[in-house]
Amino acid sequence: FTGALYSEKLRGLMTEYGVPLTVENDQTRFGKQQPMVGFFKAAGEAALPITMTFDMGNWCWTGEDPIQAAGLLAEHVGYVHVKAAVPQGTSYRAIALDDAGPGWQSLLHRLPAAVPRGIEFPLEGDDLIAVTRHYVTLLRNV
């Protein structure tokens, strides 16, 4: 977020198309905490009904603490991309929650419980239906 919100243009497009707008913290410098905080502050001041897609794993790529990000941004979260990541070379890669430590659960508890959660990591195994059911059940019970 560079400071230019174009609130009337956004409001017009949201009204014209009748779809909700959610903004995700991506893996670039624009997905860091301060640009996201600035964006949602400006959106709130403009009374724009924009929510956040909180991608739990993308904070690895930006080098920021996801727990701190949750504290700063949880009130804006309307959707959660559930993802854990581990270092790979000079970057990161998404991993299954069973292969991650317990930190993802602690992070998820700091985010709104009533918003949709999407699995955003590779589902792998011989029985993908069973694997999918496993993770859906796991996320329902966190």
Where is each model-derived feature located?
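Conserved, mostly hydrophobic/aromatic
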Residues: 21, 55, 80, 117, ...
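Generic low-polarity alpha-helical segments
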Residues: 1-3, 36-37, 99, 111, ...
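General secondary-structure edge motif
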Residues: 19-20, 50-53, 87, 91, ...
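Active-site acidic/histidine proton-transfer and metal-coordination neighborhood
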Residues: 1-52, 61
